[in-house]
């Protein structure tokens, strides 16, 4: 059993062998979670909605999501991107079903009442939390029902709040929670780089403790993946892998630990 997170920006640059490779992995059970932040930003701009990003004191950059942005986020992620991926899988004979975290109460989250950010002056500032959520539960029974019928769930990271509102949750961390809930053996983050780079060199392996230690020294995009990786390990996932999606057979190569970053104590 493997949970695969694919960054929305690399869907179009996946190697032609990627989908057939996912089909092979599906025999053992696959849940696919996708991102799509760049596409959301593009559509926001097309609709005249200026995207806003904030940075936490821990140097994590994220989208500030007001109600209108949450609606655009849902439209793009659960519509355009999700269905594009499902179509690609179906085209290669994979019985895939597209879901958002709203469907079947798949991902529940608690709406953040406030966010602490670092403002333009470099000072901490508390702002209204908007429509951003902290994941509280995953409906693993729904996923297991689909997996038991040989179906590949394709999940967009939109969560349902306590008041049934749409909430934006981080895709990497949503994948980590899904991996933990489904007792996945591993989680794979498919990206546009070979893995974690330090001093221009690929880090091939890290223990969970080493990953926690170096996380503050990593750039914002990769830092989120390392954070999600360590969270997945704490939830019982055996290993987390960060690998490039544009290489041949990216899933099989990552599982074989070829030219990627593996995080875990195994």
From Swiss-Prot:
Would the keyword Protein biosynthesis be found if you checked this record's keyword annotation?
no
Q: Where is this site: Transition state stabilizer?
A: 5, 225
Q: What class of enzyme is it?
A: transferase
Pfam families the UniProt entry points to: AA_kinase (PF00696)
GO BP annotations of the record are:
arginine biosynthetic process via ornithine; L-arginine biosynthetic process; lysine biosynthetic process via aminoadipic acid
Q: Where does substrate bind?
A: 36-37, 63, 168
Domain of life here? Archaea
Its EC number(s): 2.7.2.17, 2.7.2.19
UniProt GO MF annotations: acetylglutamate kinase activity; ATP binding; N2-acetyl-L-aminoadipate kinase activity
List the SUPFAM superfamilies hit by this protein, alphabetically: Carbamate kinase-like
The yes or no answer to whether the keyword Nucleotide-binding is present is yes
Q: Which residues form the signal peptide?
A: none
Keywords in UniProt for this one? Amino-acid biosynthesis, Arginine biosynthesis, ATP-binding, Cytoplasm, Kinase, Lysine biosynthesis, Nucleotide-binding, Transferase
Compartmental location: Cytoplasm
Catalyzed chemical reaction(s) = [amino-group carrier protein]-C-terminal-N-(1,4-dicarboxybutan-1-yl)-L-glutamine + ATP = [amino-group carrier protein]-C-terminal-N-(1-carboxy-5-phosphooxy-5-oxopentan-1-yl)-L-glutamine + ADP; [amino-group carrier protein]-C-terminal-gamma-(L-glutamyl)-L-glutamate + ATP = [amino-group carrier protein]-C-terminal-gamma-(5-phospho-L-glutamyl)-L-glutamate + ADP
> What GO cellular component entries does it have?
cytoplasm
What broad class describes the main subcellular location of this protein? cytoplasm
Which pathway does the protein contribute to? Amino-acid biosynthesis; L-lysine biosynthesis via AAA pathway; L-lysine from L-alpha-aminoadipate (Thermus route): step 2/5; Amino-acid biosynthesis; L-arginine biosynthesis
The UniProt entry, under Gene3D superfamilies, shows: Acetylglutamate kinase-like
Q: What does this protein do?
A: Involved in both the arginine and lysine biosynthetic pathways. Phosphorylates the LysW-bound precursors glutamate (for arginine biosynthesis), respectively alpha-aminoadipate (for lysine biosynthesis).
What does the similarity note say?
Answer: Belongs to the acetylglutamate kinase family. LysZ subfamily.
Protein name (record): Putative [LysW]-aminoadipate/[LysW]-glutamate kinase
Top-level taxonomy:
Archaea, Nitrososphaerota, Candidatus Cenarchaeales, Candidatus Cenarchaeaceae, Candidatus Cenarchaeum
Q: Which gene encodes it?
A: lysZ
């Amino acid at each position: 059993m493997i949970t695969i997170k694919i960054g929305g920006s690399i869907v179009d640059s996946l190697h032609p062998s990627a989908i057939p490779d996912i089909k092979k992995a599906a025999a053992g059970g696959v849940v696919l979670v996708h991102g799509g932040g760049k596409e959301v930003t593009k559509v926001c701009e097309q609709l005249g909605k200026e995207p806003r990003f904030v940075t936490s004191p821990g140097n994590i950059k994220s989208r500030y999501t007001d109600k209108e942005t949450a609606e655009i986020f849902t439209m793009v992620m659960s519509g355009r991107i999700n269905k594009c991926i499902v179509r690609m899988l179906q085209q290669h004979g994979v019985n895939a079903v597209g879901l958002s975290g709203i469907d079947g109460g798949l991902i529940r989250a608690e709406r953040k009442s406030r966010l602490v950010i670092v403002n333009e002056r470099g000072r901490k500032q508390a702002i209204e939390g908007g429509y951003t959520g902290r994941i509280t539960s995953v409906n693993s029974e729904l996923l297991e029902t689909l997996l038991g019928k040989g179906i590949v769930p394709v999940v967009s990271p939109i969560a349902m709040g306590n008041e049934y509102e749409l909430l934006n949750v981080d895709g990497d961390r949503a994948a980590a929670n899904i991996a933990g809930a489904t007792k996945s053996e591993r989680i794979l983050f498919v990206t546009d780089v070979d893995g974690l780079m330090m001093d221009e060199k690929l880090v091939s392996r890290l223990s969970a403790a080493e990953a926690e230690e170096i996380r503050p020294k990593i750039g914002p995009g990769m830092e989120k993946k390392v954070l999600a990786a360590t969270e997945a390990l704490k939830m019982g996932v055996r290993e987390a892998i960060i690998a490039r999606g544009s290489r041949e057979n990216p899933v099989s190569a990552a599982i074989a630990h070829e030219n990627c970053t593996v995080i875990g104590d195994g």
